[in-house]
Each structure stands twice: as structure tokens, then as C-alpha cells.
């Protein structure tokens, strides 16, 4: 397939994956699947724009998760996020917070070697997302 995301075979494969996910999730017309690869700063901008409605809470315990938290913190259209951090080798925990519509955490931080078992936040506002 080549190594560049600009190669026709790669673009074709990504298109098939997006179409398949759209079909799997029965997405309405006009909805799109966004894919990003590791280190894709543009993906964090897309996620900040399209997944967080107003306020987010983050578990930040490595490079991957901290980038999303920083991106949301810099987004002028969003409220100030709550960011929970921890000592190296450990992971913080979410706390239910009124007005938070998105809770975001990595499952596995390769930069620190910490992995968690994601779970919905007890007593979170109705409709809050867990990413």
C-alpha cells in the first residue's frame, strides 16, 4: 500500500473503512466518520469542535491525553475544562461535575505505560459523553 496517507490505495482503504463504519452505525445523511492516526493534532481540533458541547473533564496522565485537554482548553468557543492529572505511573479518576458534557480519557498511555479500564462517571449529567 505504500507508506504515505496520500497514496491512492491508502485513500481507498480509508474510504472503505469510513463507509463501513457509517453503515454499521446507521449514520443519518450528512454525518461523517472522522479517522485520525496517532499524533494527529488536527484530529484533536476536530474532536474539540465536534464532540465537546460546552465543558469537558479530562484525565491527563501522559502525552496522548494531555494534547486533547490542551486543545479543548485553547478552544475559544468552549468553557474552561477540568483537567485531573496524576504522578507518573498512576492515573487520576473522574469526579462528577455539574455542567460537564464530555468526560475524556485515554485507555492506554504509551508514554507512561499506564492503562485504565474506562467506566461511565457515576452521577454525571444526563447525556454526558465518555470518550
Region locations from a protein language model:
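Active-site phosphate-binding strand-loop segment of PLP-dependent enzymes
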Residues: 86-131
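Conserved N-terminal alpha-helix of the aminotransferase class I/II PLP-enzyme fold
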Residues: 1-46, 50, 63, 70-71
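Noncatalytic linker/hinge segments flanking ATPase motor cores
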Residues: 11-16, 73-78, 123-125
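Short glycine/serine/threonine-biased micro-segments
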Residues: 37, 60, 111
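Short, well-ordered coil/turn elements that cap or connect secondary structure elements
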Residues: 28-30, 77-78, 97, 124-126
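Short active-site oxyanion
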Residues: 31-33, 54-57, 127-128
